[in-house]
């Protein structure tokens, strides 16, 4: 019997989710046995992970701010060019008569 596209889609999603879960296991699940074995090392790893997350967030914020600044500069340049073109057109119309 033929499987419906919906069922095929569900199976693909299931296997895709399982593959991602196996490739990137839950950090909390990995940290629990490590915390029992060596609490100091587990705490240091948690601090390092938090620091890397903070650094990634800061980098993303800086990138967003740079993009916003570039977009603002581009919009200002376009507005200035449009204003200059309108002024030149008005001057030409005045000179014609």
Curated annotation (Swiss-Prot):
InterPro entries: Antifreeze_1. This is Ice-structuring protein. Residues 24-48 form a propeptide. Residues 1-23 form the signal peptide. Keywords: Antifreeze protein, Repeat, Secreted, Signal. Belongs to the type-I AFP family. The keyword rRNA processing does not apply. It comes from Myzopsetta ferruginea. Detected in blood serum (at protein level). Contributes to protect fish blood from freezing at subzero sea water temperatures. Lowers the blood freezing point. Binds to nascent ice crystals and prevents further growth. It is found in: Secreted. One of its GO terms (cellular component) is extracellular region. One of its GO terms (molecular function) is antifreeze activity.
